[in-house]
């Protein structure tokens, strides 16, 4: 059987195949073109986004530069300021970037009271004609003067860094800096509005040196008026006087830390207090030598004396030099011998003079606390419960961290809490001024939210901050006449300790630094007249004051920087006016409203 034979149309099949290949190639080409187009669009979009991001970031820095310059008023006390409202933007070549507009705003955010510092935010919005937006936020913080380890407006030509000085923390001067050939090491950044006029090769700048930097003006006395208002809210504004010498005052503030909860320490946040003493006799208040010292020595001192012991009654009674001879010893009880044998001197009104707390001792009086007395204080059974001014929000809800004195004030004691003490007159360091938790203690942590073990004190004087030349700080001859080294230390320690950041619109200095003993108290292995001056904090002043001399009078400096002030400056402490960079953030542009944003992030 024969099968049929089919005829094949080969030209037709070839045509179909060619058409199919053309379709495939066309599809591939179209896909390639589409992919290329998409890639171009993506690249274009990315480039555009990069431009918007750069424009927004530049806006942040431009606003910060303006509020740090002549336009500081752009930063408001509350709300926000519109700095740019849809302005065109230029690139680095000076050409306008087509289709791009920028909106920038600045205002306070976070805690806006200023108690813990001045904080703010800058918002920068870059937008193109298509409505695409990039929104950036920068946190800024106004720089506190407390951040400086050392600051001067004017450097004396006869004082320089040297003798192996080691300075931790930031240093700035608005004047030329000089270095002696004995050398100095600066462990923090150093800046000067002038230059290092001499001795630069004798210095080590571990974090760099900036010469011809911008000048930083000291705060004005008007800053004191602001602090007065905050102090009045918490019953912490007091009236002193300008009576007495430069290192004498009629008003004395004593810091006290009290264990309220019986846990064996005084570091809890509600355990800080002050007592306030007033007298018409400034010599008595600060334990100066009597007015007739040149004739009679310490014979008539009410501050200096020694203890009489009654072994039968197991009591000790302080008897001043003025009250000698004292029964039952009578004539055998010499005032001079009493001072030479375990003599002590105390500030006016001290419990140690009277053996107990005396509200009114006839020479002066302790000022009563005008607010309610906490049951926690009453429970301690202290005789001075009604005279303790709480320096914590727990026991004094209106306390803003500020104590204010109109006039001069003498200070001493143990500080528990965050406090700024401001005075229109001199602030006199009458005795040791220490934190409840030593600044070098491993228990101290100023970076966490817990205020325990975290003490900070700022001293702000409209004039000088003076270490008193009194019978406590300075070894003194019982008799003014005489020669040789018959000086006696009537203090409980052979040095002076100050835990505080110091800001004086004139000077920080030691009264009569160039007189008195030269080798009575040791500072380490070195004999000095008054021993070591231990200061932990910073010194900010118009011009440098002296604390001692090379022949041994006064103190030997032992300064160290308190890094805690970088995180937690004293309340309402004056600021330099300069805003420093903080963190930057991206903000979702969907539904963003600038007014609502500043309202949300501002708190009282």
Label each region the model flagged.
Residues 95-103, 113-118, 145-419, 423-424, ...:
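C-terminal globular interaction/adhesion domains in large, modular proteins
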Residues 2-168, 172-175, 180, 185, ...:
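Beta-strand/loop motifs with alternating small/hydrophobic and polar/acidic residues, enriched
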């Amino acid at each position: 059987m024969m099968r049929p034979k089919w005829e094949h149309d080969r030209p037709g099949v070839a045509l179909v195949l060619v058409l199919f290949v053309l379709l495939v190639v066309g599809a591939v080409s179209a896909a390639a073109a589409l992919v290329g187009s998409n890639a171009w669009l993506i690249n274009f979009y990315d480039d555009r986004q990069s431009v918007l991001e750069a424009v927004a970031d530049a806006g942040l820095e431009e606003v910060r530069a303006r509020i740090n310059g002549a336009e500081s008023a752009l930063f408001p006390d509350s709300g926000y300021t519109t700095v740019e409202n849809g302005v065109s933007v230029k690139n680095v070549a000076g050409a306008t970037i087509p289709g791009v507009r920028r909106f920038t705003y600045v205002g306070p955010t976070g805690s806006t009271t200023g108690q813990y510092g001045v904080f703010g935010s800058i918002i920068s919005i870059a937008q193109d004609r298509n409505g695409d937006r990039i929104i950036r936020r920068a946190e800024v913080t106004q720089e506190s003067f407390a951040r400086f380890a050392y600051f001067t407006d004017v450097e004396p030509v006869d004082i320089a860094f040297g003798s192996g000085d080691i300075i931790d923390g930031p240093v700035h001067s608005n004047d030329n800096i000089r270095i002696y050939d004995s050398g100095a090491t600066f462990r923090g950044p150093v800046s000067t509005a002038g230059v290092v006029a001499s001795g630069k090769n004798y210095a080590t700048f571990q974090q760099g040196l900036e010469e011809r930097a911008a000048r930083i003006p000291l705060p004005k006395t008007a800053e004191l008026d602001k602090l007065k208002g905050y102090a009045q809210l918490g019953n912490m504004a007091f009236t002193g006087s300008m009576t007495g010498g430069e290192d004498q005052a009629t008003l004395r503030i004593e810091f006290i830390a009290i264990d309220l909860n019986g846990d064996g320490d005084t570091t809890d946040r509600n355990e800080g207090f002050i007592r306030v003493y007033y007298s018409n006799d400034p010599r008595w208040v600060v334990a100066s030598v009597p007015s007739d010292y040149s004739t009679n020595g310490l014979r008539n001192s009410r501050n200096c004396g020694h203890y009489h012991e009654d072994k039968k009654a197991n009591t000790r009674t302080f008897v001043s030099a003025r009250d000698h001879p004292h029964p039952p010893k009578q004539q055998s009880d010499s005032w001079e011998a009493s001072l030479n044998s375990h003599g002590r001197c105390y500030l006016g009104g001290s419990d140690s003079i009277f053996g107990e707390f005396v509200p009114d001792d006839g020479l002066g009086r302790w000022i009563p606390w005008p607010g309610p007395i906490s049951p926690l204080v009453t429970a301690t059974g202290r005789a001075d419960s009604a005279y303790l001014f709480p320096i914590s929000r727990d026991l004094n809800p209106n306390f803003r961290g500020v104590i204010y004195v109109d006039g001069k004030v003498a200070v001493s004691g143990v500080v528990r809490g965050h406090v700024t003490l401001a005075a229109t007159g001199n602030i006199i360091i009458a005795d040791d001024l220490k934190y409840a938790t030593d600044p070098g203690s491993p228990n101290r942590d100023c970076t966490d939210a817990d205020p325990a073990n975290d003490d900070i004190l700022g001293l702000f004087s409209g004039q000088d901050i003076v270490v008193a030349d009194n019978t406590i700080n300075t070894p003194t001859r019982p008799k003014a006449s005489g020669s040789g080294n018959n000086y006696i230390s009537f203090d409980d320690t052979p040095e002076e300790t100050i835990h505080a950041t110091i800001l004086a619109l004139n000077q920080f200095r030691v009264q009569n630094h160039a007189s008195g003993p030269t080798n009575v108290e040791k500072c380490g292995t070195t004999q000095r007249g008054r021993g070591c001056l231990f200061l932990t904090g910073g010194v900010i002043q118009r011009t440098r004051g002296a604390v001692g001399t090379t022949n041994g009078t006064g103190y030997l400096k032992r300064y160290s920087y308190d890094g805690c002030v970088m995180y937690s400056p004293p309340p309402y402490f004056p600021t330099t006016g300069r805003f420093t960079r903080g963190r930057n953030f991206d903000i979702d542009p969907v539904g963003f409203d600038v007014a609502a944003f500043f309202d949300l992030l501002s708190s009282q």
